[in-house]
């Protein structure tokens, strides 16, 4: 499938149209950002690692009955996906306290959250992705109640599948972000799942194996991503 015009350029991915109006090409770049794009650096192999990582995870979720936009892997850094009507709200599932939750509530990083928390954030970089709730979604018409309930259901189902996948590989799935859209009226998982949008810690050492290595200037970003990929069985080369 040939990519045509650039449709959208995000912080780490570029979306292209194709000759099929229902399909898009998603290109993973080497860019890495923090602070809503205020800080951007490039890392060799990152686009390839995240593309193959994402394809692997989406395939696992499809196998578990979670509909995704994934169609096929095109190249090291490109994937063919369904064109979704994206919901402007992202879902976050939290198994342990980290990131904005720690800052917001003043709680200790790493404490277990049982049951896991489900948060909603409006996708708006200029406003720093403000936290919202189901009432906001209804009032502002971002997503209807039925589809939001389905998004929540699929988010928790993904958490069950992925917590086991990473757990079996000696990793803790601390939290993660999911974005959904509609394809022919059906709620479908879109965007990506990679260490860019999740927190993954080593079970024994609690070493951070995700984008916090970049956010917190810990170093070894790509090495950590590749280690996680290797542990769960992603074929990178």
Swiss-Prot record:
CDD domains: SAICAR_synt_PurC
PROSITE patterns membership: SAICAR_SYNTHETASE_1, SAICAR_SYNTHETASE_2
EC number: 6.3.2.6
One GO MF term attached to the UniProt entry: ATP binding
Keyword ATP-binding: yes
Catalytic activity: 5-amino-1-(5-phospho-D-ribosyl)imidazole-4-carboxylate + L-aspartate + ATP = (2S)-2-[5-amino-1-(5-phospho-beta-D-ribosyl)imidazole-4-carboxamido]succinate + ADP + phosphate + 2 H(+)
GO cellular component term of the entry, any: cytosol
Coiled coil: none
Top-level EC class: ligase
Record's keyword annotation contains Cell membrane: no
Keywords for the protein's UniProt record, in alphabetical order: ATP-binding, Ligase, Nucleotide-binding, Purine biosynthesis
Gene3D superfamilies in alphabetical order: ATP-grasp fold, B domain, Phosphorylase Kinase, domain 1
The protein's annotated pathway: Purine metabolism; IMP biosynthesis via de novo pathway; 5-amino-1-(5-phospho-D-ribosyl)imidazole-4-carboxamide from 5-amino-1-(5-phospho-D-ribosyl)imidazole-4-carboxylate: step 1/2
GO biological process: 'de novo' IMP biosynthetic process; cobalamin biosynthetic process
Pfam family, one: SAICAR_synt
Family listed: Belongs to the SAICAR synthetase family.
NCBIfam families: purC
Name assigned to this protein: Phosphoribosylaminoimidazole-succinocarboxamide synthase
Organism of derivation: Pectobacterium carotovorum subsp. carotovorum (strain PC1)
Gene expressing this chain: purC
């Amino acid at each position: 499938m040939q990519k045509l015009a650039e449709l959208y350029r995000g912080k780490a991915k570029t979306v292209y149209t194709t000759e099929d109006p229902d399909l898009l090409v998603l290109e993973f770049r080497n860019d890495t950002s923090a602070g809503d794009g205020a800080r951007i650096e490039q890392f060799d192999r990152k686009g390839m690692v995240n593309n193959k990582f994402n394809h692997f995870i989406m395939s696992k979720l499809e196998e578990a009955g979670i509909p995704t936009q994934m169609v096929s892997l095109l190249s090291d850094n490109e994937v063919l996906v369904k064109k979704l009507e994206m919901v402007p709200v992202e879902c976050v599932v939290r198994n342990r306290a980290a990131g904005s939750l720690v800052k917001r509530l003043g709680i200790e990083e790493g404490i277990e959250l049982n049951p896991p928390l489900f948060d909603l954030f409006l996708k708006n970089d200029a406003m720093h992705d403000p936290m919202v709730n189901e009432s906001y979604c209804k009032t502002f018409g971002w997503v209807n109640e039925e589809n939001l309930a389905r998004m929540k259901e699929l988010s928790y189902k993904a958490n069950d599948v992925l917590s086991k996948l990473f757990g079996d590989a000696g990793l803790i799935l601390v939290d993660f972000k999911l974005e959904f859209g509609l394809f022919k009226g059906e709620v479908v998982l879109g965007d990506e799942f990679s260490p860019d949008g999740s927190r993954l810690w080593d079970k024994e050492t609690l070493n951070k194996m995700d984008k916090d290595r970049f956010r917190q200037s810990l170093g070894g970003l790509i090495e950590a991503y590749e280690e996680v990929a290797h542990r769960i069985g992603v074929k990178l080369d």
